[in-house]
């Protein structure tokens, strides 16, 4: 359980990881959220960069016990407005939540976020990749299809990988298919 007790070691581990990214802690006073970076004065959430607000909100959801075994987290493009150097840390935290019984759904168009799940997951992690794409029916109309794989690289309809490959080809002037 992620949040068992006020000072559970598991919760502390999450909060410590998130504190490395946000460089502060989250406080709530009179239903207003604040980020307190180190020894600086607290900042209202609306004055904090969007990426830090996301991290601070995740911090608060863990701190208050919302994200515990059986909970579901939906996160649309967690990489948006986040410094790319923190992507591996975010993936580690999401994998930890999954290990603790939180069901995590993310959507992304980011190669690095998707690939870090492949790199950092272990055999016991329940990570699945889904690709939604349009395909022509026999009638000539397009339909939405879905493909599922246990690894990012195994998706056949993978526009993220196709775009990354195209960039690489453009950069070195060679075609890889």
State what each model feature region is.
Residues 1-70, 135-177:
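Phosphate-coordinating catalytic segments in nucleotide- and nucleic-acid-processing enzymes
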Residues 107-109:
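H-loop/switch region of ABC-family ATPase nucleotide-binding domains
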Residues 69-72, 101-105:
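Loop/turn-to-beta-strand initiation segments
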Residues 94, 98-99:
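Conserved ATPase "switch" residues in P-loop NTPase domains
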Residues 76-78:
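Walker B catalytic acidic pair
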Residues 89-91:
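Conserved hydrophobic alpha-helix in the ABC-type ATPase nucleotide-binding domain
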Residues 117-140:
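A short helix-turn-beta junction within AAA+ P-loop NTPase domains corresponding to the substrate/partner-engaging
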């Amino acid at each position: 359980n992620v949040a068992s007790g006020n000072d559970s070691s598991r919760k502390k581990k999450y909060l410590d990881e998130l504190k490395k990214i946000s460089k502060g802690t989250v406080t709530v006073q009179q239903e207003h959220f604040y980020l307190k970076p180190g020894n600086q004065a607290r900042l209202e959430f609306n004055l904090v960069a969007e990426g830090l607000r996301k991290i601070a909100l995740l911090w608060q959801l863990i701190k208050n016990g919302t994200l515990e075994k059986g909970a579901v987290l939906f996160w649309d493009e967690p990489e948006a407005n986040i410094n790319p150097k923190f992507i591996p840390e975010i993936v580690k935290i999401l994998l930890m939540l999954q290990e603790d019984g939180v069901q995590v759904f993310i959507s992304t168009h980011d190669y690095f976020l998707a690939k870090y799940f492949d790199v950092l997951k272990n055999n016991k992690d329940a990570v699945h990749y889904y690709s939604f794409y349009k395909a022509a029916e026999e009638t000539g109309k397009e339909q939405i299809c879905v493909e599922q794989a246990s690894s990012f690289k195994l998706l056949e309809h993978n526009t993220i990988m196709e775009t990354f490959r195209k960039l690489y080809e453009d950069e070195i002037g060679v075609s890889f298919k």
